[in-house]
Amino acid sequence: MRNFLVFSVIFIAYNSCEAANIQADNTFADPNIGEFRELLIDPKAGALFVGSEGAIFRLWAYNINDTGENVFAKKQLVLSESEESECRSTASDERLCRPSTRFLAFTNNLDSIYVCSSVGMRPEIRVLDSLSLRDQQEPRTEIGICVVDPTFNFTAVVVDSGNPEDATSVYSGIRTGMGGENHLIYRPPLTKNGKQLHASIRTIYSDNKWLNEPQFVGSFDVGQHVFFFFREIAHDNSFGERIVHSRVARVCKKDIGGRNVLRQVWTSFVKARLNCSVSANFPFYFDHIQSVKRVDKHGETYFYATFSTSETAFTSSAICMFQLSSINHLLDTGLLMEETANGQFSVTADEIPAHRPGTCSQNSHSISDTDLHFAKTHLLVSDSISGGTPILPLRDHVFTHIVVDQLPNQNVIFAFDSANRRVWKISHWKEGNEWKSNLIEEKSLKIAASRINDVALLPAEFFFVTSGAGVSQFSVARCSEQPSCALCSLDPYCSWNAVNSKCSLKTKTNEKSVGWISSSWAGRISPECSAVEKLTVKDVYLGDGLRLVGAKNGVWQKDGRSVESGQRHVVTRNGELVVLDAQLEDAGTYECLRDNIILVRARIVVHENCARPTSVAEYRSCQREWCKKADAYKAALNIWSDSNKKNVQCKANTSSAH
């Protein structure tokens, strides 16, 4: 009950309201292709790689419609008739037999694309030239890299350096077995020049203390480690409900397993809980990690992750950020949990052996059996890793995908709700020792499909989404829609032209030119806007509806007095003010303020009598006014008629009485 109260207080400000629809700048589709899925981008080359049912594409990231020879390539995925027939005889769903990509990654210094596809329910590995998409190696079947069933969550990362003998390898968090019943973190046998150097290595899938029905969302190669982000069943509560926690796990690249104990099993595996919660006496937890992106900035590595609550009537989402240094510190020094028949307990520091679980070794075969027995049963750190104050806690939505644009003084987060095809753009920056955020805008994406499959970002230019209908390309900013200098300067991609009073995309040229205004500080309005902000005059007629563009968390005033939502005045979630059925008392000067700074200023003039109409809108407004007057006249006439009838009846009754 207390958690519900916290939930109500925190999320009350985010009541739902329809966001504005935005059209894609460009779209790409192929009538011979089924579902469009994976995205991979090379910003320097301006290349967008797309995986789909039936093919792999290389598109020009600045215009995905351009199919010119120098910027476009297509690799068809083919299944022979005999392979298709054999697959259909065993598959539960014939769509599983269609050739379809599951995983795309760069390798060989971006010169090659590593592809794992499901072809006739077989995982097929290809290495393609990143320019022509021609095969650089013979395709091969390899288990444990990607899943056949697209409904299974998995993750994989190609690691080119730091492995034993510096052999390139893939690390995966995956489900194997006929029904996907085996959950494991896996590295296939290490080979070089066709020779096997080391056997495969994995977690123990038969022991759920290692992984308990995990749902993997991301994996990253960082230094001497590979990190895996996932959610898993932590325990069952007293009501028999399965409690889910989000985790980060870490393994060492040099790990080759133990000599006797933990043979071909990770000796360095260790994990901890990710804590994304609203602080309170009874914290409100977002326990289901949905997506994660890595950001390297100012010598530190950050992981931005989206989280949601369980799928209940009160589903909600938030974004949390985790620092690599904090993750490593906890995994390196935190107390470890031991699970017994009576529950889980933290072991004391002096019980932890000299070779601590999670420590990297140049030769894991040299670790003692005693230390490995301890590592085998002490996998979880007792404390959790804090994600700080949740960014944009929001109810009734699930943030399924995230991309992050790194700008000089801030990071811009794009969070997506796949099912509702909606995106939130958020500014996130550090001020002193405190991280702050500001919602810039929320938009609905107009795409011809029911959900988003994947997202990618071309920094400071476009974001891309895949769906069943194709690939859609959207600009990171809609500057021309900003009505004022203040709102324009809050968007880090925009700049205000003081001469033309228009908002345009910021460029290197206009950013420092005379007459152009943009904020140099994250989340702050440019002080120059106060000198150029103009009063907008809007003429309306009795009965009209009116919409004034405002800003998120803005406060509306009319002639210096606060405007509250009511029967005819509605302040939307995006900060817009909607006036319904305009009356004479609605005339005045309206201001939208935030932190006592005027963002929008407009004077509304309400005309009592219609002037001669000069447009269809004015004609309709006058028509409404005359209709109202006609209705009032009819009502008065009916009252007079009823009264007259009563008078006549009264006189007749009086005459008969005499």
Swiss-Prot record:
Domain Ig-like: 556-592
UniProt-listed Pfam families: Sema
Gene Ontology terms: biological process: axon guidance; axonal fasciculation; embryonic body morphogenesis; morphogenesis of embryonic epithelium; negative chemotaxis; nematode male tail mating organ morphogenesis; nematode male tail tip morphogenesis; positive regulation of cell migration
Domain Sema intervals: 20-476
Domain of life, per lineage: Eukaryota
Phenotype upon loss of function: Worms have defects both in early embryonic morphogenesis and in postembryonic male tail morphogenesis.
Secreted as UniProt keyword: yes
Tissues and organs where the protein is expressed, per its UniProt entry: Ubiquitously expressed.
Leader sequence segment: 1-19
Chief localisation class: secreted
Domain (PSI) ranges: 478-527
Record flagged with keyword Cell membrane: no
GO CC term, one of those recorded: extracellular region
Disulphides: 87-97, 252-360, 276-320, 479-494, 488-503
GO molecular function, one term: semaphorin receptor binding
Keywords tagged on the record: Developmental protein, Disulfide bond, Glycoprotein, Immunoglobulin domain, Secreted, Signal
Record note on what altering residue 247 to H does: In ns789; impairs nerve ring assembly due to non-commissural interneurons AIY failing to extend dorsally and enter the nerve ring. This phenotype is enhanced in a chin-1 ns399 mutant background
Localization per record: Secreted
InterPro entries: Ig-like_dom_sf, Ig-like_fold, Semap_dom, Semap_dom_sf, Semaphorin, WD40/YVTN_repeat-like_dom_sf
Coiled-coil stretches: none
Subunit text: Interacts with plx-2.
Record's function text: Regulates the formation or stabilization of cell-cell contacts at several stages of epithelial morphogenesis. In early embryonic development, required for proper ventral closure of the epidermis. During male tail morphogenesis, regulates precursor cell sorting and allows the formation of distinct sensory rays. Seems to control cell-cell contact formation through 2 parallel pathways, one involving efn-4 and one involving plx-2 and unc-129. Involved in follower axon guidance.
Family: Belongs to the semaphorin family.
Protein known as: Semaphorin-2A
Originating organism: Caenorhabditis elegans
Lineage per the UniProt record: Eukaryota, Metazoa, Ecdysozoa, Nematoda, Chromadorea
